UniProtKB/Swiss-Prot annotation:
This is Aspartate 1-decarboxylase. NCBIfam families: panD (TIGR00223). Keywords: Autocatalytic cleavage, Cytoplasm, Decarboxylase, Lyase, Pantothenate biosynthesis, Pyruvate, Schiff base, Zymogen. CDD domains: Asp_decarbox (cd06919). The modification Pyruvic acid (Ser) is found at S25. Binds 1 pyruvoyl group covalently per subunit. It comes from Campylobacter fetus subsp. fetus (strain 82-40). One of its GO terms (molecular function) is aspartate 1-decarboxylase activity. It is found in: Cytoplasm. Heterooctamer of four alpha and four beta subunits. Its cofactor is pyruvate.
Length: 115
């Protein structure tokens, strides 16, 4: 039997843009994606600390430093400047899950990784 576990998260990222006319997804700065072990087109859950919204979308690689942009319908669920948590999950065997540690990336208000 497999269980779903937290795989990684980007904690307290700041929304830098919201593009209603884009096809969909969340655009994330490539360096943040790498730090959080996120792949392009991977499904993620977005938790908006400002308004309590929780929704799912998928990742698109961003090019701008610190970029966190919600696209398409998801753009209606956030405001620029909102603080969000970007979460990914993974299914794994219970035995592996007992020893698994998720990747947690803490960022500042400019979406720079806190060392």
């Amino acid at each position: 039997m497999e269980i779903e576990m937290l795989y990684s998260k980007i904690h307290r990222a700041t929304v830098t843009d919201a593009n209603l006319n884009y096809v969909g997804s969340i655009t994330i700065d490539e360096r943040l994606m790498k730090a959080a072990n996120l792949l392009e087109f991977q499904k993620v859950e977005i938790l908006d600390i400002n308004n309590g919204e929780r929704f799912q979308t998928y990742v698109i690689k961003g090019e701008k430093k610190g970029e966190i942009c919600l696209n398409g319908a998801a753009a209606r669920k956030v405001c620029i400047g909102d603080i969000i948590i970007i979460v990914s999950y993974a299914s794994m065997k219970r035995k592996k899950a007992k020893n698994f540690s998720p990747t947690i990336v803490h960022v500042n208000e400019k979406n720079e990784i806190n060392e």
